[in-house]
Amino acid sequence: MTGLMNLTARNCKLFFKDKGMFFTSLITPGILLILYSTFLANVYKESFVSNLPEFFSPSESIIDAMVGGQLVASLLAVCCVTVAFCSNLLMTQDKVSGAIKDITVSPVKGSTVALSYFLASEISTLIISFAALGISLAYLAFCGWYLSAADIFLIILDVFLLTLFGTALSSLIN
């Protein structure tokens, strides 16, 4: 268990120490939100309004909140997977640099090494994804807020599950 904790801590430290990888992972959700809200918000809104029945006309704030919710959902779905791939590049870097040979020589099982990469990638992805969630909730507060505390809890749970999926997918591919 100590070997797993030490390797996981090592992998997390290396991810956050690499400023380029960390900064890219952190700024990507913000850039995507700006691009989504700038270019896709009007397309979503027009599509949403055009598909409403004529006898039903919700207020502009409800439509804006619905469009914002769709944008945030797509942003979080994309970020939880792409950030997982970015944070899992550490495994590839260790293979390229030969550091994995040093790790495999140590008296630690291969499954422990693989699990440490997975856990470190999950922790790193969760931190970045929760930062993206904070940015997204700020955007929703700006364009229209109709969420309850239970909704926020379910969104947090969804982000956690999405990061598990993204990390598992990136670990499987790497």
Q: Locations of the language-model features?
A:
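Alpha-helical transmembrane segments and their short interhelical loops
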Residues: 110, 118-174
